[in-house]
Amino acid sequence: MLSRAMKNLLTQLRQQGIEDERLLAAISAVPRERFVDEALAHKAYENTALPIGYGQTISQPYIVARMTELLQLTPDAKILEIGTGSGYQTAILAHLVKHVFSVERIKGLQWQAKRRLKQLDLHNVSTRHGDGWQGWPSRGLFDAIIVTAAPPYIPQELMLQLTDGGVMVLPVGEHTQILKSVKRHGNGFHSEVIEAVRFVPLVQGELA
């Protein structure tokens, strides 16, 4: 049975235009309070971003839902996530697709996320400590790629790891950021601007 807080969040998401019932069911199946510090658990179902340590955040549920919806996921999809973070977005993806590959440059976050996903019996996820700018080429190509931190421009290395017809959703920009959807058509790519967003930067090269 869903808590009142979860029901209120789902109502808010619907009011903000999230209509995919399969996605909403996945969100309702993931206890967000398990992905934040115990001291912030009372805020877990507020539609807001929360700190998770290491200067990183767990994105607000609307952005998680919006980006996931834009990926147009099918149950047999193989997806790459850049920026595992708390593992919350990863868990929602795991309820929606066949397999999730997730890269995180901060070892402490990767370890915590891996433990949480295991506790929730989500075993269709592979995580890796690595540079998100490089993706995970040995496991590609991917039907979808989601990037949960903002590069100043769209990384070509990630675009090349999309299947033909694959979709990548990511925030782009340094000071002000725009959410973009990029679709691959053969050797060409079509980019579409979605909305203004705010994310932590996608740090290149340096692992932590």
UniProtKB/Swiss-Prot annotation:
Known catalytic reactions:
[protein]-L-isoaspartate + S-adenosyl-L-methionine = [protein]-L-isoaspartate alpha-methyl ester + S-adenosyl-L-homocysteine
Biological processes, Gene Ontology terms: methylation; protein modification process; protein repair
Q: What is its EC number?
A: 2.1.1.77
Give a GO molecular function annotation for the protein. protein-L-isoaspartate (D-aspartate) O-methyltransferase activity
Q: Single GO cellular component annotation?
A: cytoplasm
> What superkingdom does the record give?
Bacteria
Q: Determine if Methyltransferase is one of this entry's keywords.
A: yes
Span of the signal peptide: none
Keyword Mitochondrion among UniProt keywords: no
Under the heading PROSITE patterns, the entry gives: PCMT
Disulfide linkages recorded for this protein, renumbered to the chain, are: none
NCBIfam families (alphabetical):
pimt (TIGR00080), PRK00312.1 (NF001453)
Q: What is this protein called?
A: Protein-L-isoaspartate O-methyltransferase
